[in-house]
């Protein structure tokens, strides 16, 4: 049976909507919202009914009846750290995300899907939600007391690509070790060991390779000196770390196509900077090969920049000796959400009940809780 699955992903200025039926894409669109309309809402949570109405209008325009949908799935922000996998979206999930203190439309994913599920009597699922945290304890330690690493990566696309690669080997995701590098606006690399992301960089907190618009790892002292110099506000420093650093800060654009055009025209600085991003990506992959003790079945490049054959080829030259390198250019979040819903409906993957309890709340050593803040 080919299930019909509706998926969605609410973003800052748009909402992605897609409907899949088996291998067929019934519809897929990115609905742009009028900035003037968005400006009328004080908080992201206040946009809930507006986004519901917008999605319904888009579905109606595409001739899709909600009654034809077998299940709902999508990008569900605000759930906090959990293990990866599939969670049933219920009132507990919705209450948590709407009151989590996060002021970003990503928190509306679960409530929108739940509303549709309530209206039609069909299930709704959160698949590999963005705050998934499966790090090994040893990967959390830093040398700065009180600062511990957490996992913030492109989890839905990361895991979907790892699953696809495992399928290509005729194996299950929990049977392989894979390193996935998502290179888009942000850049996340993760070591997947037998179905768990046991080590990652953190695209929100500013670690790992620099990205098209994020700074990545930088020397700590110079940043501290900048922060306390009185010449830069907290917002300015945080902005470079998370929004205006990386390629954008160094080259004035985060468009890989435009940068390659500059390189082709002889721009030596653009070439060096772009190569440095590939170099750092390869270094992170190499580090995670060590985390997997060299037992790596494959390296997957994904995200928009992974459509650039030159970028992928550079990384492959650096790390191809570790394991085969394949590129799945673009992102597969919508497809991954749909595939997860199908696995839930078919019973090939367990569906978990969300409790709101974090997957990591500190270190538990010999039965004792280490006195740290999660």
What is each residue range found by the language model?
Residues 109-114, 126, 141, 146-177, ...:
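Glycine-rich phosphate-binding loop plus the immediately following alpha-helix
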Residues 239-294:
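Adenine-nucleotide phosphate-binding core of ATP-dependent small-molecule kinases
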Residues 309, 313-339:
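Conserved phosphate-binding/catalytic loops in two-lobed NTP-binding clefts
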Residues 5-46:
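Short glycine-rich, Thr/Ser-proximal phosphate-binding strand/loop in the N-terminal lobe
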Residues 57-70, 168-172, 285-297:
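Phosphate/pyrophosphate-binding loops at sites that engage ATP/ADP/AMP, CoA/4′-phosphopantetheine
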Residues 296-315:
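Glycine-rich phosphate-binding loops at beta-strand->alpha-helix junctions
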Residues 59-105, 123, 131-142:
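Short beta-strand-loop/turn "lid" adjacent to the catalytic site in phosphate-handling enzymes
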Residues 327-374:
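Structural signal for terminal/edge beta-strands and the immediately following C-terminal loop/tail
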């Amino acid at each position: 049976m080919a299930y019909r699955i509706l998926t969605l992903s609410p973003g800052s200025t748009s909402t992605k909507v897609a409907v899949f039926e088996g291998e067929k894409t019934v519809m897929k669109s990115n609905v742009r919202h009028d900035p003037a309309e968005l400006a009328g809402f004080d908080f992201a949570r206040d946009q809930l009914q507006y986004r519901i109405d917008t999605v319904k209008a888009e579905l109606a325009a595409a001739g899709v009846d909600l009654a034809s949908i077998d299940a709902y799935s999508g990008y569900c922000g605000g759930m906090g750290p959990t293990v990866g996998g599939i969670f049933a979206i219920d009132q507990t999930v919705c209450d948590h995300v709407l009151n989590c203190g996060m002021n970003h439309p990503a928190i509306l994913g679960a409530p929108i899907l739940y509303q549709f599920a309530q209206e039609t009597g069909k299930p709704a699922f959160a698949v590999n939600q963005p705050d998934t945290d499966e790090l090994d304890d040893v990967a959390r330690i830093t040398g700065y007391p009180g600062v511990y690493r957490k996992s913030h990566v492109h989890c839905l696309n990361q895991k979907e690509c790892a699953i696809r690669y495992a399928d290509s080997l005729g194996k299950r995701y929990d049977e392989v070790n894979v390193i996935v590098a998502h290179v888009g606006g942000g850049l996340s690399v993760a070591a997947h060991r037998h179905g768990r992301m046991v080590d990652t960089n953190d695209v929100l907190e500013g670690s790992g390779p620099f990205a098209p618009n994020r700074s990545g790892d930088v020397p700590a002292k110079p940043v501290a000196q900048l922060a306390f110099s009185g010449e830069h506000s907290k917002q300015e420093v945080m902005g470079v770390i998370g929004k205006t650093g990386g390629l954008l800060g160094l080259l004035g654009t985060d468009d890989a196509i435009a940068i390659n055009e500059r390189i082709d025209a002889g721009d030596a600085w653009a070439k060096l900077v772009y190569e440095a991003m590939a170099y750092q990506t390869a270094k992170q992959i190499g580090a995670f090969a060590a985390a997997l003790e060299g037992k790596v079945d494959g390296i997957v490049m994904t995200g928009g920049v992974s459509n650039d054959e030159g970028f992928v080829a550079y990384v492959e030259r650096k790390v191809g000796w570790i394991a085969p390198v394949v590129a799945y250019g673009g992102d597969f979040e919508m497809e991954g959400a749909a595939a997860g819903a199908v696995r839930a409906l078919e019973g090939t993957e367990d569906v978990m009940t969300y409790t709101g309890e974090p997957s990591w709340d500190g270190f538990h050593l010999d039965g004792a809780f280490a006195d740290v803040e999660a």
